Each structure stands twice: as structure tokens, then as C-alpha cells.
Amino acid sequence: MLKLRSVLLLFAAVSASSLGVQHSVSAEATYPVVDLHVDLPYQLGFHGKPLRQGMGQASLTDLRAGAVVGVVLPLFVPHDVSPTGPRKSDLEDSYLRVLGELFHGDGLALPGCGEAPGVQTWLSFEGAGPLADAPESLDAWVARGIRIVGLVHTEHNALASSSGDSHPVDYGLTEAGKVLMRRAHALGVAVDVSHASDRAVSDVLALARETHGVVVATHSNARALCDHPRNLTDDQLRGIAATGGVVGLNFHSAFVVRGRAATLADVVHQALHLVRVAGVEHVALGADFEGGIRPARGVEDASHFPDLARALRSAGLTQAAVRRVFSENALRVLCRSGK
């Protein structure tokens, strides 16, 4: 706990200095931010956009303006990379591209938890299917900086069924998925259920009661407010909280509200519901910037995090609660993961 408190103090100092936040700005606008899901590696791998640039939602300039002190960068390999599906070599290529960018120049740093200046970064898997036939290889990936393992992405794989696959079968967590999840939790790594089907989420939460590991949803919202399969039921939210995990508030309009373009007020409504159901210690930020999303109006890019902070304060959250949601809860998971 003492180390985590020191990290938070360091991040607070960074957010007011090297990230370019003016000391004259109201304290309400300078809450340090840790975002659990920023798809800059996707832009790098498939559009050739440097990590510092992206497509304009989470550029280094936007991150600095939003007082972002840490981001989780997901490594993603689509199923159509090769005729036989994603391979571990494809994952290696993705990792090496990201690593090369992180150590080229300044502004982004690996690893996180205060070991280096700049915007701290952690790595996650978004769809760990390539590891299904070699779960022991996860050990090496954790040594390389992986702190969160998302078992599945938008299509079913050998580990779990997806909420986004066009085939309606929902087979849940497979035996291979259970093996990998047990290994992840043995290594102290959190398991991510964003993109997992309902049955898969239930299976993961059930197994977590045996493994005593942390389950997170890095970029998902409440289904009670927006009935979308990518969102979570209240029971699922409570189940994640019971593991000590967090749910990352997603800014994608289609996951915030149904039938119209979402606004900042709708994002606040989602945040308040997550806090009420999961508890303030189990809500974080996972905006999903750079992932091909249409952000809600008022939070179009990372520079608008201070606007969200002010809106949450106006809606009744205390400064301490906003600090928890904006960084402390995420850091609790990330800085203990892999240990």
C-alpha cells in the first residue's frame, strides 16, 4: 500500500508538470488519469500511425492535455492474419512494433508504476487465442510487461466465446481457457472479460472464486442503461467487484446509450450507475480511444478527461471518488499485477 501511495503522489506531480498542465488550472481539472484501454497499437499495426499520433483521439498532445499519466496498450492479432488463425509469431510481431515505438524518443515509457518519467504504459492481450496451445508461454509474456489478459475479442476462439461473434453459439470458457486463466491468476495477472459472452463471463467469475484472482472489464459499460451484448449486467458488475477487479468506463456512443448519439451527460450517467452497483473502488476508465469508436459528444478525445471530472463532481461525486475512478483503482490492479 505504501508503494502504491508513492506511485499516486508521483503521478500527481507528473500530471501538474511534465504533462504540461498549468498550475493555475482548477484542481477539479487536474485529476491524474490512467486509461485501461487505448488502442494505439491497433493504429500502429494496421494503419502505420505512430503511437504518439494515433488517429486524433489519444495523441501524445491529447494525453498531456487530459492529464493522462498512464495507459494500457492492448496487443491485438485478428483471426484473419493467417489462413490457420492467429499465431504466436504474429503476437511477437505486434509486441516488437509496440516496444520499438515505446523506446523511440520520449513521451511514452515502459514499464509503468513510476519506474520512468512520461506517460506510463502497461501491455495487455486483447484476444489471447494464440496462447491456447501453449499456456506456459504466458510466463514469458508477463516478464515482458503483460499485466492483463483478455481471453477473447470480437470472434470466438479456442479460449472462450465472444459477445460479438456473428455465430450465436455461446460455449463459454473452454478447457484451454480455464488452463490459461489459472496460469494468469497464478502469475498475478488480471483476466479481462470485455468482449466475452455472457456464459464466458459467468464461467470466468466462477473460476475466479477458486483461483482467487482478479477479473476486470477494461472497456465496458452497464447493460441496464444500454442494452448491448458488449455491456455488463448488474450481477456481472458485482461479480467483478467481488474479485477486487475494476470496470473501465467506455466512451463509445453505442455502448453508452441506445438509439441516439451519446453525450457527456450520458457518460456521467453510466459512471454513476457503475459506482452505485459495483462500488466506487471498482470503477475505472477504459475510453477505448483509437479503437474505431465514435466517442460521446463532449469526450471526443483524451483532452476532455478534465471535462468529465468536472461533470462527475457536479453530479455529486467527491474529489476522492473521482481520484479513485480516474487513476487509483486502475493502479491498484496494475501495480499489483504480475507479482
Could you describe each region identified by the protein language model?
Residues 7-18:
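Bacterial N-terminal signal peptides
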Residues 33-40, 196, 217-220:
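Histidine-centered catalytic micro-motifs
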Residues 202-207, 211-221, 299, 307-308:
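A short alpha/beta connector and helix-capping loop motif
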Residues 18-168, 178, 210, 227-285, ...:
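N-terminal hydrophobic targeting/anchoring segments and the immediately downstream early-domain regions
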Residues 1-5:
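Positively charged n-region of N-terminal signal peptides that target proteins for export
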Residues 170-205:
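Loop-centered beta-sheet repeat module
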Residues 224:
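Active-site environment of non-heme Fe oxygenases that use a 2-His-1-carboxylate facial triad
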